[in-house]
């Protein structure tokens, strides 16, 4: 190839590249044109560069100089086209935009107050050596009632006070549970079912808490809801007394509600504890009931295979919502389950 032919090819390549870059309507088209002319492997400039070897030796300096000049010109044309597509120097800038102002921080999620309370309770009880135990929310009557010393005729087993599940079917496809009868399963009405399952599997000493949902068909109002959370505590060992129970609850109350909180026991009755007490905390000058407690009834120990002559223990149950509401000054339990972000964002 002669020098004139080589120079003519370079001039034509530069002209074609200028036209392609100028006519590119968007970044994708401009990039396609760049690859066509400046591509490292198959670009047209690369192809012409390979022809330099066929130029006479005496003409190679002039051909090389022209090649470099055209390459620089094509690169400059590409950069100009790129700048034009992006709006130039300042022509596309919004005059009202101030880059020195801080950006808008995206909204962050909030942990639900019940979840916060459960985490706090778990931390407090964990410092006293209590481990978390879990159990199913769908239970059978033995774990929910029988093993807890609740007899068959006890009003707590009434279908009007529990969510029995009509899951058993007869061959005709109808439910085998008649109106007014207990079903083979129910939504647990208390987290005490977990202590039965743990004691059936583990030998003393035991020190556990169970936090979870329980279900009772209560009409929703400011203090009642069909589903709520309980914290059940269980300690089984030798020589456990009411003094141990009161100490644990006092330490818990001081950690959760403050050092100035006092505690008192009022005599009560629960089938699964004997003696049984209601637990009140003196908080902000008012005695407030938070739950029930007591020494585990020997019949409960017998149901799980423990010898009540060798071991003793206590159990307590506290309402998580009640603790949460008192701590945060919430007056209506329904607010916790309303899904109203205006309320939940406060926590």
From Swiss-Prot:
Compartment(s) where it occurs, according to its Swiss-Prot or TrEMBL record: Cytoplasm
Keywords: Aminoacyl-tRNA synthetase, ATP-binding, Cytoplasm, Ligase, Magnesium, Metal-binding, Nucleotide-binding, Protein biosynthesis
Keyword match Nucleotide-binding: yes
GO molecular function, one term: phenylalanine-tRNA ligase activity
Gene Ontology terms: biological process: phenylalanyl-tRNA aminoacylation
Gene3D superfamilies: Bira Bifunctional Protein, Domain 2
Annotated Pfam families: Phe_tRNA-synt_N (PF02912), tRNA-synt_2d (PF01409)
Cofactor(s), names only, from the UniProt record: Mg(2+)
Region of interest (Disordered), residue spans: 83-111
InterPro entries per the UniProt record, alphabetical: aa-tRNA-synth_II (IPR006195), aa-tRNA-synth_II/BPL/LPL (IPR045864), Phe-tRNA-synth_IIc_asu (IPR004529), Phe-tRNA_ligase_II_N (IPR004188), Phe_tRNA_ligase_alpha1_bac (IPR022911), Phenylalanyl-tRNA_Synthase (IPR002319), tRNA-bd_arm (IPR010978)
Reaction it catalyzes: tRNA(Phe) + L-phenylalanine + ATP = L-phenylalanyl-tRNA(Phe) + AMP + diphosphate + H(+)
Main location: cytoplasm
Coiled-coil features, chain-numbered ranges: none
Binding annotation for Mg(2+): 274
Top-level EC class as recorded in UniProt: ligase
UniProt EC number: 6.1.1.20
Annotated cofactor note: Binds 2 magnesium ions per tetramer.
Annotated PROSITE patterns: AA_TRNA_LIGASE_II
A GO-annotated cellular component: cytoplasm
PANTHER family (alphabetical): PHENYLALANINE--TRNA LIGASE, MITOCHONDRIAL, PHENYLALANYL-TRNA SYNTHETASE
Family (UniProt): Belongs to the class-II aminoacyl-tRNA synthetase family. Phe-tRNA synthetase alpha subunit type 1 subfamily.
Subunit relationships: Tetramer of two alpha and two beta subunits.
Protein name: Phenylalanine--tRNA ligase alpha subunit
Gene: pheS
């Amino acid at each position: 190839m002669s020098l004139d032919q080589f120079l003519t090819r370079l001039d034509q390549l530069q002209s074609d590249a200028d036209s392609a870059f100028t006519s590119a309507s968007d970044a994708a088209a401009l990039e396609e044109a760049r690859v066509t002319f400046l591509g490292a492997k198959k670009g047209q400039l690369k192809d012409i560069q390979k022809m330099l070897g066929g130029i006479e030796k005496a003409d190679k300096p002039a051909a090389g100089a022209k090649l470099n000049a055209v390459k620089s010109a094509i690169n400059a044309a590409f950069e100009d086209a790129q700048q034009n597509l992006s709006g130039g120097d300042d022509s596309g800038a919004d005059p009202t935009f101030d880059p020195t102002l801080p950006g808008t921080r995206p909204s962050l999620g909030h942990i639900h107050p019940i979840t916060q309370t459960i985490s706090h309770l778990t931390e407090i009880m964990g410092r006293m050596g209590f481990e978390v135990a879990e159990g199913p929310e769908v239970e059978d009557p033995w774990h929910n009632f029988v093993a807890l010393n609740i007899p068959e005729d006890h009003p707590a087993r009434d279908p009007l006070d529990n969510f029995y599940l009509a899951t058993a079917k007869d061959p005709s496809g109808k439910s085998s549970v008649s109106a007014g009868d207990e079903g083979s399963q129910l939504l647990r009405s208390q987290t005490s079912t977990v202590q039965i399952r743990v004691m059936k599997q583990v030998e003393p000493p035991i020190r556990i808490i169970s936090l979870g949902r329980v279900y009772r068909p209560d009409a929703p109002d400011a203090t009642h809801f069909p589903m709520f959370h309980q914290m059940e505590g269980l300690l089984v060992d030798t020589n456990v007394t009411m003094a141990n129970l009161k100490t644990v609850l006092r330490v818990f109350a001081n950690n959760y509600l403050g050092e100035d909180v006092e505690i008192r026991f009022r005599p009560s009755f629960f089938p699964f504890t004997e003696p049984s007490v209601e637990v009140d905390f003196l908080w902000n000058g008012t005695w407030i009931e938070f739950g029930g407690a007591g020494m585990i009834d020997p019949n409960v120990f017998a149901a799980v295979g423990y010898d009540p002559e060798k071991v003793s223990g206590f159990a307590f149950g506290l309402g998580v919502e009640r603790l949460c509401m008192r701590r945060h000054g919430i007056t209506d339990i329904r607010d916790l389950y309303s899904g109203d972000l205006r309320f939940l964002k406060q926590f």
